[in-house]
């Protein structure tokens, strides 16, 4: 796919991986819809980092845990930027949930944001892509889908579901729409992870270092520019899955 002047929706574009992906795609000439929930300042910073003509981009707020808000989000994006050609399901939450202490609200929150939202976004946008005759969907999964962490079981379950969803969507939307996923390993660490856990994750990788958000952005771009790949889960983890 030629990315120039295509419209892409990046969910969770105000921080970390989403910000890096959005900036990378904006610099490649795409019209970027920057979704955020609470990180309005982060979304504005992403817009500034993209440079160029910021009028061809836009920031859009939505709580993706609610399907009605997803529907409004898509409507607003299409009104401003046109039909969505590319969907990047990046928005997610991540925090410790030790077994025996997990509340129903924590479970519902993680599953709703990390799995339910990508499904309904993909259903809405994917059916529109089918009518257009082409499109790309890239989900941001996690190597924890295959190597679950005991202290983060609901999160790991949500990402395992996203991996399955990726493969199912690739079948359901073929041949017009390609659906793939990037599975990051240890990136720049969120504040919830201890320095000990960071060091342990690095030690378990073959490359003995953490990845950077730009590593994920480049993997996403690979999927968008390649028209003969679908249903693939690409680990970007410094070889951690092989080393485990």
Where do the protein language model's features map onto the residues?
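Substrate-binding pocket helix/loop in short-chain dehydrogenase/reductase
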Residues: 98-99, 106-111, 137, 201
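Active-site helix of classical SDR
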Residues: 122, 158, 166
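C-terminal substrate-recognition "lid" of short-chain dehydrogenase/reductases
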Residues: 134, 212-236, 241
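Active-site loop-to-helix junction immediately N-terminal to the catalytic Tyr of the SDR YXXXK motif
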Residues: 102, 144, 148-156, 168
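Conserved glycine-rich cofactor-binding loop
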Residues: 7, 14-15
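Alpha-helical segment proximal to the catalytic Tyr-Lys
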Residues: 127, 170-175
